[in-house]
Amino acid sequence: MQTDAVVLDVDGVLVDVADSYRRAVVESVDRVYGRTVPVEALQAFKDAGGFNNDWELTYAVALYVLAQREGLKIPTEEFAAHVAERGGGLDAAQSVVADMPSISQARVRDKWDRDRLREVFQALYLGSDRYRDFEGGDPPFETEGFIHDEPVILTEETAANLTDRFDVGVLTGRPSAEADVALDRVGLDVSDEHRFTMDDWEEGKPHPSALMTLAERFEAETVTFVGDTLDDIRTATNAAEADPSRSYHGVGVLTGGLTGEEGRKKYEAAGAAAVADSVNDLPALLE
């Protein structure tokens, strides 16, 4: 596959976040509401689209848990399917809950505390020291932080190969400070102008604007975007539709929530140009 520039997602591509971000989602809801969903259930929300921001994923899971308390009788996968039918993301999750009886809706809304959920999420993920550094205050409780439980996927050899052969950028839903931690850990030096984080754009994936901007900055005719979710592939296909002057390839990796043959089929159905076992297969895939 020919390309001029390679743009990398972080979570599930450069580092494994199964025991960090995803764990923080389910445990945040459990701490605040005393019940949650299995971590495996999160993939259905991710597949629904619109949950590149894990805070919003946490809020949606909390909505589902609260709705269950008020009489919602559908499994997680069915709830996520309804979310997908309504366009994905947090607004769609709220729309599904809005189909409940008005009294039940009101009870859910009264108990749904996004500020508290975010506070707990950040404390669990960052740990006490980084919470004070990044959030500018004391955490709600003391903890070491799941951020330390992110095994590196990208090898030094792969990083050197990609940066020697191509322009390399980063496009992630992480806040900037948290992206810095991951990039430092994998030893990937990417300038500010060649990366987009949660802090740099409002739309989030799968909106193509950030990927298109990186293509412009690289002056690249062909861009390959590597991610671990269907929204990453949709970002590339949306960019190809919005910017026909360039070619955009979406490559899915099987080191995130999508794995095995089922994950491969989902990527292909979403329009992936290729599916790789991991980011470390990219050097052989790209020309």
Regions found by a protein language model. Give the residues of each.
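Glycine-rich phosphate-binding loop signature in dinucleotide/nucleotide-binding domains
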Residues: 1, 162-166, 217-221
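Active-site neighborhood of HAD-like aspartate-dependent phosphohydrolases
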Residues: 1-50, 56-59, 63-68
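Substrate-recognition element of Asp-dependent hydrolases with the DxDx(T/V) motif
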Residues: 25, 134-141, 146-184, 198
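A metal-dependent, Asp-based hydrolase signature
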Residues: 49-149
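Short active-site oxyanion
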Residues: 166-170, 222, 271-272
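Substrate-recognition "cap/lid" segment bordering the active-site pocket of phosphatases
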Residues: 171-224, 229-241
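Structural recognition of alpha->loop->beta junctions
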Residues: 188-199, 262-287
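Acidic, Mg2+-coordinating phosphoryl-transfer loop and its flanking beta/alpha structural elements
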Residues: 226-274
